[in-house]
Amino acid sequence: MSNSHHTSQGRRNKLSVWVKKIINTTTTTNASVSSSKPRRGTRAGPTRVKRAELDPDGTTISSSLRPLVDRNSLHSSESDDEGDRRVAWDEPPTGKVRQQQQQQQQQQNDNASVIPLVSFCSSSVKSSTFSDIHSIQSTRPTIFSNRTFETNSSVLAIPPQSILDRSRTLPPSNASNTTTRRP
């Protein structure tokens, strides 16, 4: 008993050393991360963040401090607000009417989009008639044997003739007699 006690204690020591290594690595990592974070009590923290965001040479900015919007897009959006804007229907309609007429003429001359629809409809009618004929035939039995009845979809077992004869010759049960009697 004492020998097994010593081996289990040795295993515990090995495990604890392994666990201590993991704990030490995580605590050193956490300590380095917490030391890199700005402390809340100082006033210089927010100004440092702003300087880091505006500094073009700053390459060590953490991902939480990077701006989400590009500086160029900010400047272009401000200039867009200052410029005059037009509504789409303020343009003169003469150019659009001509374009619409040209498109209508092209659509009238283009029969390529109609041909597949006609052929698709005719083939679908033929295929549905064809499948109906074959579906009727597929319900008929294809192979007969003494004990099995095979169709295209499944194999059904047919009981032997002796079992069928027994069911015909059995006297009616009491339950069936009581339910069929009328007063």
From Swiss-Prot:
This is Uncharacterized protein YKR045C. The keyword Cytoplasm applies. Residues 170-183 have a biased composition (Polar residues). One of its GO terms (cellular component) is cytoplasm. Its main location: cytoplasm. Keywords: Cytoplasm, Isopeptide bond, Ubl conjugation. Coiled coil: none annotated. It is found in: Cytoplasm. The keyword Ubl conjugation applies. There is a cross-link at residue 21 (Glycyl lysine isopeptide (Lys-Gly) (interchain with G-Cter in ubiquitin)).
